[in-house]
């Protein structure tokens, strides 16, 4: 079990949108936070130690693992990525962080996976984490690979882990799909808090959504982990209607991954 009063937790990608939400949601109770990113980290609290570093700098990663009990891995490139950056950060960088954690004796890793790890399942199927991955893109493939890596670290080295298949993380839902897949800032902090506090999660994969009325997945691991999301995208339907968003028509995409499952890949990185 990770002790919020005494154990040091390292958050990578701490200057990003989710990293910032985690800082806001965790620092009141988690008293020893070590934060890292390639960008400056704004307004650190007294219990937040900041380190500017790149996950591709293995020596720096190994140094920052000193005294760390748990790693919350939120680093990653997405969107308009190049193939080179995808391999450098989402493959090699991820491996270096996991391996440095093992060498340092880290007890637990909380990993930002993605719903794009199962994005090719048809939307008619209520996907649970018990099903094998069906990634919808290279991005989703690397996220699924991270889950598989953590399985190996658990089986071979006993490192506990929770992989979070994060849905649409935004301050508010923006379209019909995100009414099902939204993960709010408050709920992402609650989910990570549960992943850190659980006495023994083993090697767990959970879907990272809020308590959305239109949710199209099924996850018994929420109850096991003690995750009780408080926010619901449905509360924002009037706002979206007022913006002219079609929230009542047929589902636009036939797969869970939405447009990712139909978008062309960029094998050359161009």
Regions found by a protein language model. Give the residues of each.
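NAD(P)H-binding glycine-rich loop region in Rossmannoid oxidoreductase-like domains
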Residues: 42, 52-89
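N-terminal Rossmann NAD(P)H-binding glycine-rich loop of SDR-like oxidoreductase domains
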Residues: 7-28
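Conserved Rossmann-fold NAD(P)-dependent oxidoreductase catalytic core, especially the SDR/UDP-sugar
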Residues: 96-134
């Amino acid at each position: 079990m990770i002790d919020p009063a005494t154990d040091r937790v390292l958050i990578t990608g701490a200057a990003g949108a989710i990293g910032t939400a985690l800082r806001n949601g965790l620092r009141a109770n988690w008293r020893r936070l070590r934060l890292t990113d390639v960008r400056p980290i704004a307004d650190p609290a007294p219990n937040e130690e900041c380190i500017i570093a790149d996950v591709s700098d293995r020596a720096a990663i190994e140094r920052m693992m000193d005294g760390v009990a748990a790693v919350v891995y939120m680093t990653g490139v997405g969107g308009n990525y190049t193939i080179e950056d995808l391999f450098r950060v989402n493959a090699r960088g991820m491996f270096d962080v996991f391996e440095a954690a093992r060498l340092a004796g880290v007890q637990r890793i909380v990993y930002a996976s993605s719903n794009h790890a199962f994005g090719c399942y048809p939307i008619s199927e209520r996907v649970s984490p018990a099903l094998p991955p069906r990634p919808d893109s290279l991005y989703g493939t690397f996220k699924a690979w991270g889950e598989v890596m953590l399985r190996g670290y658990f089986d071979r080295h006993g490192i506990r882990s929770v992989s979070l298949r994060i849905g649409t993380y935004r301050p508010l839902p923006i379209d019909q799909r995100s009414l099902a897949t939204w993960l709010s800032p408050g709920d992402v902090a609650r989910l990570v808090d549960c992943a850190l506090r659980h006495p023994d999660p083993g090697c767990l994969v959970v879907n990272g959504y809020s308590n959305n009325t239109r949710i199209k997945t099924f996850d018994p691991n929420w109850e096991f982990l003690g995750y009780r999301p408080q926010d619901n995208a449905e509360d924002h339907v009037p706002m979206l209607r007022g913006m002219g968003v079609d929230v009542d028509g047929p589902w636009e995409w036939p797969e869970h991954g939405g447009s990712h499952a139909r978008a062309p890949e960029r094998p050359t990185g161009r």
